[in-house]
Amino acid sequence: IAILEDDASDGGRWSADTLVMLLNDVTEWLVELKETKYPDLKTDLLFCPGWMAYANSMSGNDSDVQKIQKLHEGTGDNVRIVMTGGKIWGDVTTAFADRFYNKLAEKKEPGRYPYLWVNWPCNDNTKDSLVMGGHNNILRTNLDGSKYQGVILNPMQDSEPSKVAIFTASDFCWKIWKDTDEGDQAWDDAFKYIDHMTPISSESSDALREIAKHMITQSPGQAGKQGEFDESVEIKDKLAAFRS
């Protein structure tokens, strides 16, 4: 279950006290259901704050950060505070997780690590692009996986192309990549499963992978916010020569 306040307004619509009461009431309800009706029910509760501390990366002391600190102080460990990585178009890094934890620990020990909602392969700001790659720009190698309570994606409006990111992120979360080659291998493997759900490549899965090689880069405006994802890498020199 998730309660989402994101984009409600600057700083969110509701006060920290109101949200703490809501989250604790819902937690009590979930625990009651688990004890009386549904023994396998999970009581984890995701909560996404209104502004998700985009601009300050959890390093300041403004009202956004103070609100999240109060949520940490007033709720149990079952509440997962959802963030986007210190900015709207964030990535999965140990550095942000540590800043988040330490900022919450200033008010209550121990701190709490974030649940990351990464805006990838989301193409809301680049609707003329399909983001069918860019994994190594988002899913950072040698991450300390214990420092995130979870990682979820914001997919594109196009469901089928989004499966490339879903597959690669699933591989990453199952076993954090030690180097970018592991990420590239996961990306390469994705198309066999997307196309026909086996580990054996086929003519159609190879064709899908070939198309995807050239459908990765975002529009210039989006690339400036997120870091540009390279595409057509294997023919990059030939393209440059042709354009010149």
Task: Locate the predicted segments by residue.
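Catalytic-core regions of glycoside hydrolase
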Residues: 8-184
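C-terminal functional modules
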Residues: 178-244
